[in-house]
Structure formats: C-alpha cells, structure tokens
Amino acid sequence: VCSSDLMAKIWAENSYCKRRQVGALVVKDKMIISDGYNGTPSGFENLCEDANNVTQPYVLHAEANAITKLARSNNNSDGSTLYVTASPCIECSKLIIQSGIKRVVYGEKYRLEDGINLMKKAGIEVIYLGEKE
C-alpha cells in the first residue's frame, strides 16, 4: 500500500458521515494538490444522514470535493493521480475524466462498476488495491 493511499484513508476519517467515510487525494509531481472527503457542502450542517440513516441527497462525494476544491486553487489536475478509498461512482467518474486526471487508485469495490468501466473507456489507468481476483 502506497503512502498516498494510506493518507487518503486517514483523510476519510475527517468525514462526518456515519454510514460511510471516504477520502480522496489528488497527487501531481509527487505533491498533494487537493484533498476531499464525503460530506455536506460548505455552510451546511455536518449531518450526512437523515433520521432514518439515509444519506442526504446534497452530500458530496470525496472525489467531487477534491476536484471542485482544485477549481478554486491555482493548481490543475492535468495528468495527475487520484487516490480514493472507495471505487468512484459514475457521476464522480465523469468529473474525473473532465478534470484531466489520468490515473485512479482505489481501495474498496462498489457493487456497481459503471464508473470504473467509464474511466477505462476514457483511457484512464485504473488500479484496484484490494485482493487479487
């Protein structure tokens, strides 16, 4: 396990979400240029789930938080690597493709693989760090 993957796991612990904590790091030229974890938008109360433990529809995924944070910085993600603790969904995969990220390393599979398949179709190198099949 590389240090960036381990750091993404530690970053996930910042999430206020109870059901699932996900962390993401964008690395370029061996430097972390952005980070994110799943949670509510800025200015919202840090409650990810409703009274029935269902995730609120406005909760942002870790990848989306990391990528949108880049949009407000002087960095760009062209040719970078995204380390994320869980497999990106289809919506985050579209953001990853459009942001110029060229490599995604993830540690936990999701029941749907449409996001992974879309990134591969777009020519992004996708690496799963879990058990070999």
Residue ranges and their predicted role:
Residues V1-E133:
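Zinc-dependent deaminase catalytic domain
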